[in-house]
Amino acid sequence: MNQELLEILRKEVKPALGCTGPIGVCFGAAQAYDAIGGEIKRIVAKIDWGMASKIDDVAFPGTEMLGVEMAIALGAVCGDPKAGLEVLHNVTPEGEQKARKVAELVEVHPMWERKDMNIYICLLY
């Protein structure tokens, strides 16, 4: 039984850089931007309330950024989509400034979902 539990943990537990709810939003934004690319004009993120409801209280590693809009912008601008939940491993001060500018100048719109979505983050660019 202990071996079976260890196998499940090895398969399911992944390293994360930061709190997993907000980092999940960053990861979703990085994945979406990687798939679409180009100039960011608008980002709409449909986010499961239960996953990231306290996101405004959590700072992102290596930055002074807080909040869902910043999570979306930071993931889209600086996120490494191949890094999984360590998506922000390469954020620089310059990248942080670029993300702040995107959050300020571009329509970054979070939509909170309170029903069972069967997915946790849905981004539209």
Residue ranges and their predicted role:
Residues 1-22, 39-42, 47-58:
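N-terminal alpha-helical transmembrane segments of multi-pass membrane transport
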Residues 14, 89-102:
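C-terminal catalytic/substrate-binding lobe primarily of soluble NAD(P)-dependent oxidoreductases
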Residues 118-120:
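C-terminal binding/interaction regions
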Residues 17-22, 61-67, 89:
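Active-site nucleophile and cofactor-binding loops and adjacent substrate-binding regions
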Residues 107-114:
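Active-site loops and adjacent core secondary-structure elements that bind or stabilize anionic groups
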Residues 125:
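Conserved small/polar residues in nucleotide/adenosyl-binding loops
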Residues 42-84, 96-107:
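A structural-propensity feature for long, helix-poor, extended segments
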Residues 22-38:
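Alpha-helical support elements that line or immediately flank enzyme active sites
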